[in-house]
Amino acid sequence: MSRELIRTVDAWNKVKIARDPNRPNTKFYINEIFDEFIELHGDRNFGDDKAIIGGIALLNNLSFTVVGICKGENTKENIKRNFGMPHPEGYRKALRLMKQAEKFKRPVICFVDTPGAFCGIGAEERGQGQAIAQNLVELIGLKVPLISIVIGEGGSGGALALAVADKVFMLEHSIYSVLSPEGFASILWKDSSRAEEAASVMKITAQDLKRFNIIDKIIKEPRGGAHKNPIKMAQNIKKTILEALGEMKGTDLDTLLNERYNKYRNIENNL
């Protein structure tokens, strides 16, 4: 990605940056931000979806449950992780781990980076829509602090299933939308080649979503994008997580849950 392109930072350029194959993924951030991480597997029903990483982590002697949608770092790993498109068993694994966090009173940190939930026949047969809907229902009432960070693409319900949280953050050049610009252009204008125009109309950038109060904060990226200095980006995310937890530390559970509920109930008033 050229320096000139980064400087332009219009919506379509941000789409390109968010999709950059060299952009740090969830696995990288987990390894860089947390002192220790033990990965847990499976949804206890069908199998283990490699598109979602989850487990228990330590940071500054505090325990967390960390769950994230992960793209691959190369073609082989992308195939293994289904290019960051989770199956229903992935969302059920995520929910299993978050309910476990509730039981043991661990805060939950979610990383979101997906073009969307996988829409194959098998995924539909195993209840993709139900799995996503169940996550939305459960997360709105989960009795622990929840932080969600969009680190690249935040595509549709597949992203939202890990993004109902007390604090929702986006990296500076990430995107978050109901569907891809290509999909939007194809459906509304019957012309996928108008994706660049669609990206601007859709208001999918972190700056747009902060203005509408859909998200709580934009995390600044290093000059040139997160992939130019991944370590610095991880440090920025770590600092933001710790600051957010500090803000929520003195909040009693009832207040936390009421504020989370009202946050989503009142979104329409900001549009």
Swiss-Prot record:
The keyword Lipid metabolism applies. Signal peptide: none annotated. GO terms for molecular function: acetyl-CoA carboxylase activity; ATP binding; carboxyl- or carbamoyltransferase activity. Keywords: ATP-binding, Cytoplasm, Fatty acid biosynthesis, Fatty acid metabolism, Lipid biosynthesis, Lipid metabolism, Nucleotide-binding, Transferase. InterPro entries: Acetyl_CoA_COase_a_su (IPR001095), ClpP/crotonase-like_dom_sf (IPR029045), COA_CT_C (IPR011763). It is found in: Cytoplasm. It is an enzyme of class 2 (transferase). Its EC number is 2.1.3.15. Pathway: Lipid metabolism; malonyl-CoA biosynthesis; malonyl-CoA from acetyl-CoA: step 1/1. The keyword Oxidoreductase does not apply. GO terms for biological process: fatty acid biosynthetic process; malonyl-CoA biosynthetic process. It catalyses: N(6)-carboxybiotinyl-L-lysyl-[protein] + acetyl-CoA = N(6)-biotinyl-L-lysyl-[protein] + malonyl-CoA. Residues 1-247 form the CoA carboxyltransferase C-terminal domain. Pfam families: ACCA. SUPFAM superfamilies: ClpP/crotonase (SSF52096). GO terms for cellular component: acetyl-CoA carboxylase complex. Component of the acetyl coenzyme A carboxylase (ACC) complex. First, biotin carboxylase catalyzes the carboxylation of biotin on its carrier protein (BCCP) and then the CO(2) group is transferred by the carboxyltransferase to acetyl-CoA to form malonyl-CoA. Acetyl-CoA carboxylase is a heterohexamer composed of biotin carboxyl carrier protein (AccB), biotin carboxylase (AccC) and two subunits each of ACCase subunit alpha (AccA) and ACCase subunit beta (AccD). Belongs to the AccA family. This is Acetyl-coenzyme A carboxylase carboxyl transferase subunit alpha. It comes from Clostridium perfringens (strain SM101 / Type A). The lineage of its organism: Bacteria, Bacillati, Bacillota, Clostridia, Eubacteriales. The gene is accA.
